[in-house]
């Protein structure tokens, strides 16, 4: 299952192919 949201907080799931995602929160 890939990320469908362009802005996500889940760095463990890769984004869907063709979409550019950015982490809107930094855990580390």
Swiss-Prot record:
Keyword entries, A-Z: Amidation, Disulfide bond, Ion channel impairing toxin, Knottin, Neurotoxin, Secreted, Toxin, Voltage-gated sodium channel impairing toxin
Keyword Disulfide bond listed: yes
Disulfide bridges in this chain: 2-16, 9-21, 15-25
Entry comment describing in which tissues the protein is expressed: Expressed by the venom gland.
Localisation per UniProt entry: Secreted
Residues bearing the modification Asparagine amide: 28
Pfam families: Toxin_12
Location (main, coarse): secreted
GO cellular component: extracellular region
Gene Ontology molecular functions: ion channel inhibitor activity; sodium channel regulator activity; toxin activity
Biotechnology (record note): When conjugated with a fluorophore, could be used as a tracer in surgery to discriminate nerves from their surrounding tissues, particularly during tumor resections or after traumatic injuries. The dye is conjugated to Lys-4 residue and this synthetic peptide shows only a small decrease in ability to inhibit Nav1.7/SCN9A compared to native peptide.
InterPro entries: Huwentoxin-1
Domains (record comment): The presence of a 'disulfide through disulfide knot' structurally defines this protein as a knottin.
Family classification: Belongs to the neurotoxin 30 (phrixotoxin) family.
Function: Potent and selective inhibitor of Nav1.7/SCN9A sodium channels. Inhibits Nav1.7/SCN9A peak current (IC(50)=13 nM). In vivo, does not induce visible signs of toxicity when intravenously injected into mice.
Stated name of the protein: Mu-theraphotoxin-Hsp1a
């Amino acid at each position: 299952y890939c990320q469908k949201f362009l802005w996500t907080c889940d760095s463990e799931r890769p984004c869907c192919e063709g979409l550019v995602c950015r982490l809107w929160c930094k855990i580390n």
